[in-house]
Amino acid sequence: MAAPRGKGSRSSNSRGTRGARGKRQRGGRPAFETSRVEKINDDGLSGSDAEAESPPIDELSSDSDDYDADGEEKKIEKPYNTLLQLFNTSQDTNGPARKRRKVDHNSKKTEIQVEEQDELHDEADLSEPEITDDDEIEDPADVAAEEVEAGDSGDENDNSSSLSLNIKAISSKGWLSHKSELPGRFRLMFSHPDTGGDTVQLPAPIHGLQSLKLKQKLALHAGDHITKFDSLASGLAPSIFGYHDLLFGARTLSNSARFRDLYCLHVLNHILKTRDRVLKNNSRSQKVPDQDLELRDQGFTRPKVLIILPTRQACVRVMESITKLYHAEQQENKTKFYDTFSAADDKSWENKPDDFRELFGGNDDDMFRLGLKFTRKTIKYFSHFYNSDMILASPLGLRMVMDKEDSKKQDFDFLSSIEVAIVDQADALLMQNWEHVEYVFSHLNLQPKESHGCDFSRVRNWYLDGQAKYVRQTLVFSSFITPEINALFSSQMQNTAGKLKITPTYAGAILDLPLPVPVKQTFSRFDSTSPVNDPENRFKYFTNAVLSPLVRSSAGGRGNPSASGTLIFIPSYLDFVRVRNYLATSSQTENLSFGAISEYTSVRDVARARTHFFSGRHSALLYTERTHHFRRYQIRGVKRVIMYGVPENPVFWAEIVGFLGLDPAGAAEAAEGGVRALFSKWDALKMERIVGTKRLGNMLIEKGGDTFTFV
């Protein structure tokens, strides 16, 4: 198993020591525009020094009473609270009275401008009734249309005996897997619970949205933005809308927007189906109040969808997909959202790679969370979590509100009824702190600590029985798959409907190098008995077989030209610390001068290390993968590359090896120095992306030697 990334601390800056470029409030702290899951303690709290705490139970509405005929939440006003509110209003002389929003019923598109207020006081009174244009008598034609749509309840497993059999098989790890090839050099593995029955078949590919059961509100406009499917989308769309789990390990710049639109359409459709079912059952119960109807149509809390993203700008892209598919007449707090989540790209990044600009362009702050509430005519940003249909957040943003030192203040009940969980750009989350992702998933679909006003007579049986995780759909999109992501696939994707894993067939990063001359690329395999022992075995091999020749070449002194220009690339920060300390203290390396750059190195020290390396004052330079991920430096003066381990991201291979050609005059000499990379059998996933799928097998099992050279 790969070594932990980073220091394992709770906090993580968006771009190493640089921090986020997004807009911040006064005082230098990130703007914390977020849904509140905790009650606000007004005693002596103000501004950014205040922490939000859990709201009282009576302020939280259950799903069964959340909606009226318009899809709005019902507002129950208590006479005493109303009287107290009027009294407080009459006594307030500190400022003008709040203006009522004028409603224009003829407007097709209305953006509600909200006043920027202190975030604690802005959402302090959660029970304050909202004034919206949905508070009017509906057109009877609209009501009839919604009644037709409400009959489509979606895909559910209401057969308790079948569900029990599937859960029993999953609990005993009884999965039956089938592998196949997909068009476009993709590989598919479909796994479903092995209950001893007939083999489960995947749904047939589709060629457009007309084959999907979409709510009328979405079907009217979705075709304008999602046109004809390619072969990959045709095969995966039925599984996404069929509530299968999916691990998609082939996310690229070219297909990311297409799949983002697909999963946004899916979750919107799911939210509308859930809402219409509740509305329909509310109507049924009101028509026959004397009958004891079994209307189980919801979970413990309202939030049904969780989307985990790496940055605020990624959240903006998801919201752009949502708003173009869900035509709302009003978008409350839209301006506030774009002011605090979006930013312009850095013009100095024009020469940065495309994948870097996609991830870090705009607002790259990785500490955020956002609640979204949908009604028939409105999208409300920054809604309270327990009043939200969807939550968009970064792993760090969620953990900061879930994991409190005081156990009484911990709150993750809002994740108890998540039915669709999505992780986009999982490879970027690996470079932040993957432990936060694991923490969030370990708290999904747990039994809530409080009732939060829940009507338990309407809660589905699998929630009451603690089986919700077996019905939850999980979608994970990543540019590549790592052991950590595979562990998430194995341990957290437990859907009784089955799960898919999509991986591409790799040609190999060694074939696509940005160099004018061929470069010798050597891979040295070392023996490693287990993932636990792999770091120790790697270090011993490096110090004995790799470092010794490097030290001998440095014996001639600092001015020896053959000893300079060695870049040592180290993927893991823990390995970086170990190698750095060894080079600094070992008698073996007393004649080797070196510099070191990690994700925690200050800008000043980075500049000094690069200058000394380029001038030859330092013979070697240690350089970590996370540093390259966050900075994409162009290191000059490189004459040979030693890779302590191959990078997770195959794009980095070409970029690191490309350092050899940054000085055209010395390109031939650098090509002779070449690249040497260390690997073991536990690096199979990384090595497949570097050397290619066809070459990997022989390199892992070859008994005739442990060194492989490609030119």
From Swiss-Prot:
Record key words, sorted: Nucleus, Ribonucleoprotein, Ribosome biogenesis, rRNA processing
GO MF, one annotated term: rRNA binding
Family matches, as Gene3D superfamilies: P-loop containing nucleotide triphosphate hydrolases
Subunit structure: Component of the ribosomal small subunit (SSU) processome composed of at least 40 protein subunits and snoRNA U3.
One GO location term (cellular component): small-subunit processome
Residues that span the membrane, as ranges: none
Biased composition (Acidic residues): 60-71, 113-137
GO process annotations (BP): maturation of SSU-rRNA from tricistronic rRNA transcript (SSU-rRNA, 5.8S rRNA, LSU-rRNA)
Compositional bias of kind Low complexity: 1-17
Keyword Cell inner membrane: no
Role this protein plays: DEAD-box RNA helicase-like protein required for pre-18S rRNA processing, specifically at sites A0, A1, and A2.
Organism: Ajellomyces capsulatus (strain H143)
Chain positions covered by the region annotation Disordered: 1-137
UniProt keyword annotation of Nucleus present: yes
Regions of compositional bias (Basic residues) in chain numbering: 18-27
Family note: Belongs to the UTP25 family.
Pfam family, one: UTP25_NTPase-like
Protein name: U3 small nucleolar RNA-associated protein 25
Subcellular location: Nucleus, Nucleolus
Biased composition (Polar residues): 82-94
